């Protein structure tokens, strides 16, 4: 079950969650997931990452954040966006967001 999150409501909705997984794609096209603590700045999500995530996001700028549910019956928040990378900081400009949980 998925519910669209309007981008103008995303910052408020993301405040209900804590940390997130940053999903990037490696050179061999395998996914790479790391835990991050994104913050908001100028309408974008900003996070400090390691070398591998920074290289991946530089090479392939389509990235995703997945905020896990607060409890086992809750929704995950999934945010797709475009990355800008400067040193070890990735800035995700949101393009789409959904709340998702398994169908019951």
Language-model-derived ranges and their functions:
Residues 1-19:
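Short, basic/aromatic recognition patches
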């Amino acid at each position: 079950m998925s519910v669209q999150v309007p981008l103008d409501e995303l910052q408020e909705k993301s405040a209900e969650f804590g940390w997130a997984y940053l999903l990037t794609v490696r050179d061999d096209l395998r996914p790479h997931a790391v835990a991050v603590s994104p913050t908001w700045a100028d309408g974008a999500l900003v996070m400090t990452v390691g070398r591998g995530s920074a290289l991946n996001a530089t090479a392939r700028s389509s990235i995703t954040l997945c905020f896990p549910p607060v409890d086992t019956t809750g929704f995950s928040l999934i945010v797709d966006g475009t990355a800008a990378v400067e040193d070890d900081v990735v800035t995700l400009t949101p393009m789409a967001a959904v709340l998702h949980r398994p169908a019951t």
